Amino acid sequence: MDSVRRTYTIMRGRHIDKRVPSKEFLSALDKAETAVRLPTGTGKDCGNPSWKRSLPHVLVASLTSLLFGYHLGVVNETLESISIDLGFSGNTIAEGLVVSTCLGGAFIGSLFSGLVADGVGRRRAFQLSALPMIVGASVSASTESLMGMLLGRFLVGIGMGIGPSVTALYVTEVSPAYVRGTYGSSTQIATCIGLLGSLFAGIPAKDNLGWWRICFWISTVPAAMLAVFMELCVESPQWLFKRGRAAEAEAVFEKLLGGSYVKAAMAELVKSDRGDDADSAKLSELLFGRSFRVVFIGSTLFALQQLSGINAVFYFSSTVFKKAGVPSASANICVGVCNLLGSTVAVVLMDKLGRKVLLIGSFAGMAVSLGLQAIAYTSLPSPFGTLFLSVGGMLLFVLSFATGAGPVPSLLLSEICPGRLRATALAVCLAVHWVINFFVGLLFLRMLEQLGSVLLNAIFGFFCVVAVIFVQKNVVETKGKSLQEIEISLLSSTQ
């Protein structure tokens, strides 16, 4: 371990690395790493660290995803009673604002998520994301006006904007390589559980006008749990290493991986950090530097994810099912169950089939299901056929989304981003996600009225086909590779 520490000192000392001859430096580093490479197998027999050490930390971080899913769906069943109680019933613009204001707040939160995560660390960033979600949900639950509701939703959105970025960072950085995909997918399961929970919680709102307030109060409990339990979790070793706290990073690796894997993990960090400036990442490096390709892939994936229309399904599925003559409560629960089922499949397959295969299959399945829904709203099928194709197509759409297009983009981006730029790159890409999400939420009902279901589904389906082509041509496979191996491979290919 001493050789790794010496190499670390050379690299991280202020400007010392600029005076070290390149060949001498690389030779010293290679000698330090010769006997401490991380295993790349897929099980215990291959010498991998136990996944049980990191699991509790991932579960606590997943509370952010649970809150994300809950707030994503909390207005689905309750929007009608909220509009009646607060006096804007029938105003589609106001109803759209209740949804999209949250997304506007999420955009603001995502813009600053990288600065927060790099500035105060991942653990404190989680706690800072919980605070506006607690305050915002409390404001929404107790308000008597539309403006109060919008303020509360905006504050919740800020927390939602910070949370997913930090979750993707943290889970990626504390997970062993051989289960990183599984853990990344498990956060999507937490999102599904939160979404399904919001749908169940909202069922009484149909008969109890004031029940929607209880639905908002419920969300303060997991937010408070996140803030408290994060005190018991470890900090990201990558963040500690970047801050010059190598000894603490070693201690964290020992907790996460076990003592016999600390040397290998530290050597990998040193290798990925060699030659990099220790200063904080700059936005210009992402937009004009050698990491632009990473940001381009991530931003495009998030954009296509939203342009597929998935969140329009979650926000307004009650309205869509009502038009099809299906009881919204039971249909929405079916949506939540399909989402959970697809996410479970993703957990099983993520580290077996890989990210790229799941993305292609997911977007292809979504395109097919949108085609079925478009046919349902033509004059071709019988009334029963219309019901079967519209509802069945929507459920297939959600199932397909949850197997790849849902969990993969944030996981993939957190894997392919260079360590020093990871938080900033995620913030930029998630900002793109929230901007498009905002406009989809704001304009979906109006577009449904003016364009009709057939044309709208055709537009969403077109973007799914574009996504299949884009993934095939641009996305690299990261299954089973350490973060440092991925980073070195990508950066060397762009030089």
UniProtKB/Swiss-Prot annotation:
It is a multi-pass membrane protein. It is found in: Plastid, Chloroplast membrane. CDD domains: MFS_GLUT_like. GO terms for cellular component: chloroplast membrane; endosome; Golgi apparatus; trans-Golgi network. InterPro entries: GLUT, MFS_dom, MFS_sugar_transport-like, MFS_trans_sf, Sugar/inositol_transpt, Sugar_transporter_CS. The chain crosses the membrane at residues 55-75, 97-117, 131-151, 154-174, 183-203, 214-234, 294-314, 330-350, 357-377, 384-404, 425-445, 451-471. Keywords: Chloroplast, Membrane, Plastid, Sugar transport, Transmembrane, Transmembrane helix, Transport. Pfam families: Sugar_tr. GO terms for molecular function: transmembrane transporter activity. The keyword Transferase does not apply. PANTHER family: PLASTIDIC GLUCOSE TRANSPORTER 3-RELATED, SOLUTE CARRIER FAMILY 2. May be involved in the efflux of glucose towards the cytosol. Belongs to the major facilitator superfamily. Sugar transporter (TC 2.A.1.1) family. This is Probable plastidic glucose transporter 3. It comes from Arabidopsis thaliana (Mouse-ear cress).
